[in-house]
Amino acid sequence: MEAARPFAREWRAQSLPLAVGGVLKLRLCELWLLLLGSSLNARFLPDEEDVDFINEYVNLHNELRGDVIPRGSNLRFMTWDVALSRTARAWGKKCLFTHNIYLQDVQMVHPKFYGIGENMWVGPENEFTASIAIRSWHAEKKMYNFENGSCSGDCSNYIQLVWDHSYKVGCAVTPCSKIGHIIHAAIFICNYAPGGTLTRRPYEPGIFCTRCGRRDKCTDFLCSNADRDQATYYRFWYPKWEMPRPVVCDPLCTFILLLRILCFILCVITVLIVQSQFPNILLEQQMIFTPEESEAGNEEEEKEEEKKEKEEMEMEIMEMEEEKEEREEEEEETQKEKMEEEEK
């Protein structure tokens, strides 16, 4: 124990400069560690067009639809739809845990389908996975009685998940600062076409794929169709009500833009040709004036007009005086003639 004292005193002596100049370094190191830890714990939510994200939720939908109990005879195979995912993203940006008010409106949530279905999930952002959200919807089957088609609670998400006629799905997850009592929340929305209802059972029970269409084939216990399942990329379509709306120039917009550029070029060429053929048709001094020059020019014009008016007045006065003199001369001559006649 006694041998450790010099070491302790030496350590304290070396730590004195640290107390003076190294406190700031320690604070900066602590801040860096906090930032590093937060960055490691932070999760980045996937984009709605991320391929891995799309494959995850589409495959899980088909897996759960193909594994329904009782077995389904007419459930369709689901594929991704970009317009539905854009609608999910647009509504998710509002950070409202309420259903989209445009689902039944024509071309408001999809350029082709109307009567769109929608499932929603809200939870902490750092806990989100597509699997957790979709399986929470599937868990609602516990509240659904397939025999009489009734729910003991809210099972609308499950019904839409296994709705037989739905074959297109598009999902998106959006971060929100707060939804309800959840801070740093994530809202996950999936849209379906055609959408389901609560008016009947979600599918027809029976041996899988026995009630598929004529041109359908059985894929993973579901009815697939190459034409129906073909992906359509709606390049220029976005929800009209999305704010802020993405800037998109469709073919008509591109045509008008090119037409304006062409007209501008033709106008410039025409002006250059006219100026080359008639060099004096436009004089720069006559076409371009500064405000001071224009005011000075106006004053000069007014002065010139006043001079002209004065000159005209003077000319008129001179003419009147000349006429008066001529009359007086004529009168004098007439009087002289009369006098001469009288003398004779």
UniProtKB/Swiss-Prot annotation:
Expressed in which tissues: Highly expressed in testis. Detected in prostate, kidney, bladder, lung and bone marrow.
GO biological process, one term: sexual reproduction
CDD domains recorded: CAP_GLIPR1-like
Residue span, SCP domain: 58-192
Ranges that cross the membrane: 254-274
Induction (UniProt): Up-regulated by doxycycline.
Annotated segments matching region Disordered: 292-344
Gene3D superfamilies: CAP
Biased composition, class Acidic residues, residue ranges: 292-304, 312-334
InterPro entries associated with the record: CAP_dom, CAP_sf, CRISP-related, SCP_GLIPR-1-like
Keywords noted in UniProt: Membrane, Transmembrane, Transmembrane helix
Compositional bias of kind Basic and acidic residues: 335-344
Places the protein is found: Membrane
Cellular component GO terms, alphabetical: extracellular space; membrane
One Pfam match: CAP
Primary localization: membrane
Topology of this chain in the membrane: Single-pass membrane protein
Family classification: Belongs to the CRISP family.
PANTHER family from the UniProt entry: CYSTEINE-RICH SECRETORY PROTEIN-RELATED (PTHR10334)
Name of this protein: GLIPR1-like protein 2
